[in-house]
Amino acid sequence: FVPTSFALPQINSDERMLWIHAGPHKAASSYVTERLRKNRAALATHGVLMDGDNNLLANSIAEKNYQPLEQALSDLSSDFRHILISSSSLDTRILKRSVLDNLNNLALSHGFKLGISYFIRDQQSWLNSVYCHRIRRFRETPDFPDYCDYIMNDRDSWDIAYPSKFKVFKLFPEITTLFLPLSKQVAVTDPFLALVAALDLETPQGEDGWLKGESSKQNIQPGAKGIWMSRLCRQVVAELGFDPERLARKGKVIRDLAIELGWDRDKFDGFDQALLDRVSGFYQHSNEAFAQEYWGVSWQQLFPTKPAASSIYSGPQSESERVEMRRLMVRVIRGLQLPLQLRRRYFKLYDAAVERVVLPSGH
């Protein structure tokens, strides 16, 4: 395996910089932010002041309140040369001319240069990941192919055609933009290590180097069975006339069950070959233009095309599996604290939905 080399902007760690790592959502952002916090002391020895664990600076920027940032820049002791903010909540919020104008002027007025970084993920894996995230959290979401169409064609959805998503930066050539490919084809595949290396921060002395992050179960995909269960659960609850919004923040009930049963090892993948070809074809031209402009290599070198590997669970396929999945759904409904008077009707609707899954002959 020969890793693909690609161009990045030269960043000098001695230059005074206000650095914002803006995610995006579902691109290792929780892992990166958590590990940066864990290494707060090591970053400080490099002259980097990390935003507080309460995300004060990120949250205030998100609310267009620049006072805390102004304070941090003017009060920064001479031991520090960088302020580092890491939050995927800023992903699209800072891609507005007025916001960048404010941040840029604020940085320059205190003798700092503004830098902004993002990880770049191939659209197929991002779509799959965001879809699962929504289903897991019981959000109203169409079928996977329709969700892909919505993202590709609806102007109000996420823009993941990168040249258009980041076009506002063309108005600010003085801002340093760093786009790191979330790719297995590069020499440093760990996102945290790739970011600190790109920021010209040397690995701390000692055998440990950078401290490891805590592994979090928070964003684990509950696997194809967990996605089926979450989706059906929301659908049945809505049919009962119970507001599915009341399930908000309870997605961990199914996620914890999925981890306990090892479902998370059999990941949901919604792409058949036709859909995969359609999505990759849709972004092909803009991806190539983006890769050539920022990395000086072809998109294919960093994100080679792989054949579809669809993995979708469509319901129990045998009588014993049906009994088992129903038993588990009873556990889930208890965990979700669905009102007792609704539970009998819930299982009537659940059983009817499972009946519609055609059992293979001979079961």
Predicted regions and their residues:
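Anion-recognition interface
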Residues: F1-H363
